[in-house]
C-alpha cells in the first residue's frame, strides 16, 4: 500500500515538474520571438535612410533586440516642409502604405531650417509654414490608420552653423543653435496637441558634434563630408538605448 502511495506521489511530482518545464519553455519561446508579429514603420531623413554612412543604424540595433518587422521609408534630404527635389513628409504619407503598421516614428529634420522657411506656430494648418506642415503630416497619418501608434522623434544635434552647400545651390544658409532650439520646441508642441509621445534626441543624445574628438570618433568623416550631422555605426550604437524603450512602448501599446 505504501509502495502504491509512493508511486502515485512520484507520478504526480513528475507531472507537476513536466508542466512547469513546459510552461517555462513556452514562455522562453514567446520571449524569444519578441515582437515578431509587429511592424514598425520609419519615416525620416538621411539619419534613417539606408546609406553608406552607417553599416548598422539605430533601427538595426532595435530590430535585433525586439525582433519586430521594420519598414523604412527614410530618405536623404527630406523634412516636414523641405521641398524641391525631395517631397516633404506630408506628401510622402500619400505615397506609402500605413495599413499594416503597428507603430510609426518620424525622425527629423533640420533639413527644414536654413532655407528661409517661416517657422510658424503649432496651430498652423498650412503648407506655408513648418508648423503647418508638421500638423498636416500628423493629421494625414492618423487619418490613414487611426490604430497606428505614432511617435515623434526630434533631430539629434547638428554641428552648429552647419551649411550643406557652401555654393548655395541647395539654398541652405546653415543651422544656428537658436534655429534648432526653436524648431525642436515647435515640434514638441505640435506632438503634444495630438498626445503623441516624443523621444527628444535633441536634448537627450549625449554626443556633441561641435567637439572635434567626438566628431572624429562617432560621426561620418571622409573626403565628401566632415559635417557633424550623420552619426556612424558607433554613433548609432550610442543612440540605440534611447530608441529601444521608446519603440517597445509603441509596439506594446499598439492594437489595444
Where are the language model's segments positioned?
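Catalytic His-Asp segment of secreted/periplasmic serine-dependent ester chemistry enzymes
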Residues: 155-256
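Alpha/beta-hydrolase-fold catalytic nucleophile elbow
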Residues: 107, 153-154
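A short helix->loop->beta-strand "cap" motif at the edges of active sites that frequently abuts
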Residues: 144-149
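Solvent-exposed, acidic/flexible segments
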Residues: 40, 51-55, 127-134, 177-180, ...
Amino acid at each position: 500500500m505504501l509502495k502504491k502511495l509512493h508511486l502515485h506521489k512520484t507520478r504526480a511530482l513528475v507531472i507537476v515538474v513536466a508542466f512547469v518545464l513546459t510552461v517555462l519553455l513556452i514562455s522562453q519561446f514567446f520571449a524569444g520571438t519578441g515582437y515578431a508579429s509587429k511592424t514598425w514603420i520609419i519615416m525620416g531623413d538621411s539619419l534613417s535612410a539606408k546609406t553608406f554612412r552607417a553599416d548598422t543604424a539605430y533601427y538595426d540595433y532595435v530590430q535585433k533586440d525586439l525582433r519586430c518587422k521594420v519598414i523604412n521609408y527614410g530618405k536623404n534630404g527630406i523634412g516636414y516642409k523641405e521641398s524641391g527635389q525631395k517631397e516633404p513628409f506630408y506628401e510622402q504619407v500619400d505615397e506609402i502604405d500605413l495599413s499594416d503598421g503597428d507603430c510609426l516614428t518620424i525622425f527629423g529634420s533640420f533639413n527644414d531650417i536654413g532655407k528661409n522657411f517661416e517657422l510658424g506656430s503649432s496651430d498652423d494648418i498650412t503648407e506655408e509654414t513648418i508648423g503647418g506642415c508638421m500638423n498636416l503630416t500628423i493629421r494625414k497619418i492618423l487619418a490613414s490608420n487611426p490604430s497606428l501608434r505614432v511617435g515623434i522623434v526630434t533631430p539629434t544635434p547638428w554641428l552648429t552653423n552647419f551649411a550643406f552647400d557652401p555654393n548655395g545651390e541647395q539654398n541652405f544658409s546653415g543651422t544656428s543653435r537658436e534655429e534648432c532650439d526653436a524648431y525642436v520646441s515647435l515640434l514638441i508642441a505640435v506632438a503634444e496637441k495630438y498626445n503623441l509621445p516624443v523621444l527628444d534626441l535633441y536634448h537627450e543624445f549625449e554626443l556633441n558634434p561641435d567637439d572635434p574628438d567626438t566628431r572624429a570618433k562617432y560621426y561620418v568623416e571622409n573626403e565628401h563630408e566632415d559635417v557633424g550631422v550623420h552619426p556612424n555605426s558607433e554613433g548609432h550604437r550610442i543612440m540605440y538605448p534611447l530608441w529601444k524603450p521608446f519603440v517597445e512602448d509603441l509596439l506594446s501599446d499598439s492594437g489595444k
